[in-house]
Amino acid sequence: MQPEFIHLRTQSSYSFLESALTIEKVVELALLHKMPALCLSDRGNLFGSLEFSLYAVKKKLQPIHGVILNIQYDINAFAQILLIAKDETGYKNLLKLSSLTFTKNDRKICEHIGFEDLIKYQEGVIALCCYTDGIVGKCLLARKQEQAILFARRLQAILGDRFYFEIMRHDLPEEQFIENSYIQIASELSIPIVATNKVLFSEKSMHYAHDVLLCISEGVTKEYPDRKTVSENCYFKSPAEMRKLFSDLPNAIQNTINLRERCYFAAHPNPPMLPNFSTQDISETYLIRKYATEGLLARLVTKFKAENISLEHQEKLKTEYFTRLNYELDIICNMNFAGYFLIVSDFIKWSKKQGILVGPGRGSGAGSVVAWSLLITDLDPIKFGLLFERFLNPERISMPDFDIDFCQERREEVINYVRSKYGPNRVGQIITFGKMQAKAVIKDVARVLSLPYKLADYLTELVPFSAINPVSLEQAIREVPELANAAKGNGLYNLEGDAELIKLVLDTSLILEGLHRHSSTHAAGIVIAGTDLVDIVPVYKDANADMLIVGYSMKYSEIAGLIKFDFLGLQTLTVITNCKKLLKEQGIKIDFDDMTFDDKKTYQMLCKGKGVGVFQFESIGMKDALRRLKPDSIHDLIALGALYRPGPMENIPTYIACKHKLQQPDYLHKLLEPILEETYGVVIYQEQVQRIAQVLAGYTLGAADLLRRAMGKKIKKEMEEQEEIFVKGAIANNISPSQAKSIFSTVAKFAGYGFNKAHAAAYGVISYQTAYLKANYPAEFLVACLNLELNNHDKINLFLQEAKDNGIKIIAPNINISEGYFSVKSSNTVITHSTKSVISRLNCDIKKIAKDTAVKPLYCKDESTIIFALGAIKGVTANFGKLVTDERKARGAFKSITDFIERLPPKSINSKLLENLIKAGCFDELHDNRLQLFLSIPKLIAYSTSYHQEQESNQFSLIKVSSLSPTILVSSDYADKNTLAFYEFEAMGLFLSNHPLTEYQGIFSRLNILNTRDLYNKLPNGTNRVTLAGVIQKKDSRMSARGRFVTLVLSDPENIFELTIFSEEVLKDYVHLLDVKSLVVVNCDVVKDEGGIKLTAKSFLSIEDVMNNRQFELQLYPQNYAELEQIITLLASRTSNGYQSNAKATIYLQSKDVKHFIAKITLSETFFLQVQDFEVLNQYIR
């Protein structure tokens, strides 16, 4: 049957925010209308071409590749042209032309090509002069018929019979205005006309949703008057509709069929294409064998020396290692992967020569001796029992895949090296596409339809969040009752609003969900090709970047034949690098190359659960696991890293019990003891599954890898086939069928969540390295951690608390000592002359300062000290800190706040920055009244402006202000401790010198209010009801399928902790207490298990309520008459006289030497104590 019509103007969502159709949808529509072919012609790119081609071929539809580009025809004048690939040459030219629009230097107005580009790359290309948006149409709309004919002739001369006029009928006035002239020109020049229809949505009823999509693209609402719109006729018309529409131009319809017959190319998969590593006449096979052999010899020399191996044993090991090396080399070379290994080895060797820290390995690649020999990995695979077949299976050919971790700060240097070696046109990043997912699409649509923000925000919160498997809107409506109710037009349960508008938002969102919204780049993927990328794939380049980006997603880049290399930036490696730099400045050199993993101090620290900052071991649950495990070898760290995941986690107690000989290991069979001995009978690693199959059932390691994969996928048919092979092999090994089936079942259960040992071992090594640095050089290590988290105040708080727990002193921010980043000072810290004078003055005048004034200790003369970074203060950058440091180095310490203002550029200081510097205490050394400085900020900023204006105009005052002046600072009392504590919290996101709850700790212990430090030490596993106190630092409202819940982040003097409120009643009853900065006592359930602890709030009290409603039994110990007098005076003023009381008191009088008591006085009166009283009494409570 002769086809009736073929659409040539179909756009998908790869025309970002312009089409409401996915690739799958356009193919389905073509099949629905019985079209034998379809042309995908997205605007400006070929990003979807391979995906379209593969899907169309799969569905037995002929794909035709097209692209709509802008072409420049005059100065600042651009028109559209539709280019279609006739054959493979034409497709490659489309790749070049579409890529040129992104890589040309003159793309400021729009991405475009020029006539010279079309001339250069016209071979195999069919061109359609777009109708009203094309050159001819634009000239006719401007009433320039002669110019229209001129350009038509020019394009015809370039393309010959491959040039067509497109004609459309969307019932638009501009189309009708030019139609007669357009057809006349085509006739005069013998240019065939082809009928098209813009296809931007599936059916006419989708026009409204598509209109919303266009509003999203422009960032406007539906009511906005001057915005882009399209005709309601831009839908996927049927052949019958098109034939009827162009009944007067039957040739225009027939030409779509004729054009289809001229096109015979479909984009297809390509085999992997790597560049040639060797530019000389030397084979890659020769090179890899040469470099690997030399590398292994060097590795063994280091190994023998570090492990003190005898000469006799060295020869045995050499035989073992070289046998394995040659086995691997044979497989690698037979698979033609030598070049891949050489390329990876080359850029890693270069990185190490430049001092760029590279991870010891990642993924299964660490199981290769060849990789170890070529310095790709730093893990001895034989020593750690790693398998090459887990990485490269000779029985299942697939590309090897090395994921490489680099120091995050220097990753770009490695990428630039690769670009320079292989050519910038052959190396690129990989594009990624952001989609309009459930929450995002609701926000977008709600904004366009002017739904009030509060309602829009509530709607998005109703969609459950899942980072791993994002919940679709359809699924959310199905599973969340309130959303389902709203989707039916019945409104929301908890908020009033226009129910019909809410329904319209959800209906429209359902239509637009899943469309591409924007593009970005893959975080780590880099491709290296053997030819220019544009010969294989479309390329894209960001206007502000220099590096090419492959226009296919990662999946389709690999199908197109490109090889991906993952250049990952691992922050932990940056921590290690920076820590080693700090130690090098002190003359301490750390070399991990010959590390033996036996440092006692490291394991002692880990046994105490001190995992803060230690790679992989930072979570609360992991720290508890360390305390229970008490690791004493690198193998324990590797195993714990592999076990601490959902599923395997349930085996942690068994592993620990067997390690400490509280339980006998179950090895399943005596033959398996050597395989499972290392992990106490627990099958942890995928490599163990492979070895079990090899030893018990006679599998080759390659076949065992296929078994492991089958067990992981749990495909029933495959599992049945593998079980039959396993049992048959075990029977041949004198094992009964029933035992063989039992072992297979047990191993299959473990294999389902078994971990890659090569990866676990490599990351276990990084864990050990960080633990070693922390155990032996805690100050330097924690400073390295802090400096990567300058803007993460929760992490800063955590690391500083860890420093205090390690006996490291913290110097608060100080404008005369602090730098942009955190720094370490040892006991020989230089104390400036101004500091000495302040300390002397404070010693003399301390008694004159009000009791409620907080003066921080400024310096520590003990061992290592961490100096707080200026860049960690909110609104202050590390660059500003450098500016301050450079000024101090050049002209000495600042003498006053006005001296500071005078010496720094006025543009570098603003009110907010100055406020946070003051609140953080940066000027305490220069002026001890922070409140006064804070209140004086407007005058200080005004002074800065006038002073620098005078400097610029050279009109200097006769009297220069050089110290604090009453004309600049307002008069003020001193702030109390809590005010200063919250100043610091506002400026730094943490309580540094004083926590608001510190003064209550003695009282809390009497009221059975726990400190967070006690949660792990004192509570058994299971669910416990406890009372905690904290300051609310963060409040976050979220929504799950079960309803709304609130997460609170609190702190006490020891820790930051998180608790959740699930009950709406609790939220309603205590909402008045749940503001940020509130001091609360919370009654909560604590669930403690291997996964950590989870806190769920049940009720709250304010600190005042606790003080007013609890009875205190005070035991007071004055040491002299003055102290006794102070106690009596205070208590006398708080006598309850029979009314409300909260305390009884007993006073113990002591001898002068404080060794025994003279008298015990139990006071008969009761007292009503207030919060501030404990500031005085706390010093006498034991």
UniProtKB/Swiss-Prot annotation:
Database matches in SMART domains: POLIIIAc (SM00481)
UniProt GO MF annotations: 3'-5' exonuclease activity; DNA-directed DNA polymerase activity; nucleic acid binding
UniProt GO BP: DNA replication
Domain of life: Bacteria
GO cellular component, as recorded: cytoplasm
Catalytic activity annotation: DNA(n) + a 2'-deoxyribonucleoside 5'-triphosphate = DNA(n+1) + diphosphate
Keyword entries, A-Z: Cytoplasm, DNA replication, DNA-directed DNA polymerase, Nucleotidyltransferase, Transferase
Entry EC no(s): 2.7.7.7
Function of the protein: DNA polymerase III is a complex, multichain enzyme responsible for most of the replicative synthesis in bacteria. This DNA polymerase also exhibits 3' to 5' exonuclease activity. The alpha chain is the DNA polymerase.
Protein name: DNA polymerase III subunit alpha
High-level lineage: Bacteria, Pseudomonadati, Pseudomonadota, Alphaproteobacteria, Rickettsiales
